[in-house]
A protein has these predicted regions:
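Extended, low-complexity, charged alpha-helical tracts
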Residues: 77-79
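Low-complexity or membrane-interfacial segments used for flexible interactions
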Residues: 1-61, 68-71, 84, 95-195
């Protein structure tokens, strides 16, 4: 019988973080499990790297990003009782001391192109600009003079330049950013702009 994911030692995550070049991931907005909503993420070799499995009936206020073997890497939780969309990201499945917070920009007084601001302890880390609905976003590092650290782009077929649609896209992560953080920000964008 075919297994959803074989038992193997996951070395993909380590090799992703140690890369000196940009990592190109293919993100498929579909869970590997039946009757689940989520994401399946592959590297350029076609190996499973990350996955997110949420049951259809469950609220999407608590999302767990897992590696290929199902170990939790990051927990993404919606902050309750906040103005606007605000998400807290924790290491593993803990609920203490968030690594960072991502908040939708809703200011009408400024002419910002930013969709989301990512901060840690009141220090802005990243700004996300572009259009998630068009799968054209850039994650800019505020600490490095707005240097692009990751990008979401439409994925096209190798032959004929045919686009796959909005459920399959590329996540290009520069070496300065952890791929799991870039994927967490992609999940948050999807939750904020899902309609």
């Amino acid at each position: 019988m075919t297994k959803v994911h074989p038992k193997f030692q996951n070395t993909c995550e380590k090799s992703l973080c140690d890369s000196k070049e940009a990592v190109v991931l293919t993100v498929w907005k579909k869970s590997l499990l039946f009757n689940c909503d989520g994401f399946t993420v592959y590297n350029s070799n076609g190996e499973l790297v990350f996955r997110v499995d949420n049951y259809m009936n469950c609220p999407k206020d608590n999302i767990v990003l897992m590696d290929a073997s199902g170990l939790p890497l990051l927990s993404i939780r919606r902050k309750k009782l906040s103005l606007g969309d605000c998400w807290m990201v924790y290491d593993g499945e803990t609920q203490r001391d968030p690594i960072f917070t991502a908040k939708k920009n809703v200011s009408i007084m400024t002419n910002k192109r930013s969709l989301v601001s990512v901060s840690s302890k009141k220090t802005v880390l990243y700004e996300i600009e572009g259009s998630y609905s068009q799968r054209s976003c850039k994650i800019l590092d505020e600490r490095r003079n707005k240097k692009k650290t990751a990008e979401i782009k439409k994925k096209e077929a190798m032959v004929g330049g045919v686009a796959f649609g909005k459920d399959v896209f590329k996540l290009i992560v520069e070496p300065e950013m952890e791929p799991r953080v870039a994927m967490a920000l992609t999940i948050i964008l999807d939750q904020i702009y899902r309609y």
